[in-house]
A protein has these predicted regions:
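N-terminal, polar/charged subdomain of small-to-medium soluble alpha/beta proteins
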Residues: 1-110
Length: 110
């Protein structure tokens, strides 16, 4: 899996980059059909200085996206990964259901 890491409006330290890439590797262990992933961290200058994590995952023609805003980058990354995990579960269930319906239709025709 190819992972692209981008930081906007700030310069990340190496620990943050490694943490984000390690989190993406956990998703890859769950589903090996991930082709590419992009992690974008940004900093919104507001009263509370919001940290935003955007994670895009490409899975065989489908793009999954999760965006989280919290007060820390680690929390934002974790929350976005949890969202993507749920999306991957739904995607895998959808693929599994499609294969079952195809078998059922063939049996009904016979």
């Amino acid at each position: 899996m190819e992972t692209k890491f981008t930081a906007r409006h700030f310069k990340p330290h190496d620990g943050l980059r490694e943490y984000a890439v390690a989190a993406m590797e956990k998703l890859e262990r769950y589903y090996d059909g991930i082709v590419r992933s992009e992690i974008t961290l940004s900093f919104e200058r507001a009263r509370n200085s919001v940290k935003v994590a955007e994670v895009h995952v490409t899975v065989y023609g489908t793009m999954l996206k999760a965006v989280e805003k919290t007060d820390e980058y680690h929390k934002s990354i974790d929350a976005a990964i949890i969202k993507l995990h749920r999306q991957l579960e739904r995607y895998k269930d959808k693929l599994h259901d499609k294969s079952k319906t195809a078998v059922r239709k063939i049996r009904e025709k016979e």
